[in-house]
């Protein structure tokens, strides 16, 4: 058995959504590094469900891999932001795994709480390199340390942030999200900014 951290934006698909649907394909990953991690997964692997693009970000719950090597259908959908025109049914480029809901942690484990925990000093999500990948490996010790933190009420000064993040796990009410639209924090790199042209100096005559 192996352990993983998988990121998702809670306003698109959070732990509350996974609790509702029970099982969901983890579509929309468009990083070859993250894809390689998913290809290394096995049925039964445990997952830390990370909420990204919220204040504060952190671990909201637990999931488990129930199916591997699933073709990511969003790559074929021209209306999807994850459409890949190079992908074909005969030669798909992107695959994913299906995960099932396991639990919502009693207490949200923010990144600040994780940074303050010595047992998590080497955890990839807390490092500069590789921290932005939406799928990352974690050690068994790191997984168990995070689960333990999720059972303990945050110290004074932290509960407000934890409660705010917990509220963020529930998506804003409105039109239901269509299945297959994605929830993963995207790894797409922004194009480099063009240098600003220097203003020309007027020549003295």
Model-derived regions, located:
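GIY-YIG nuclease signature motif recognition
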Residues: 6, 62-66, 139
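Charge/polar-rich, low-complexity and marginally structured segments
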Residues: 104, 119, 131-158
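Compositionally biased, charged N-terminal/linker segments
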Residues: 1-43, 153, 161-167, 171-183, ...
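RNA-binding accessory domains that recognize and position tRNA/RNA substrates
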Residues: 205
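Hydrophobic beta-strand signal
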Residues: 48-49, 64
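Aromatic- and Lys/Arg-enriched surface recognition patch
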Residues: 64-133
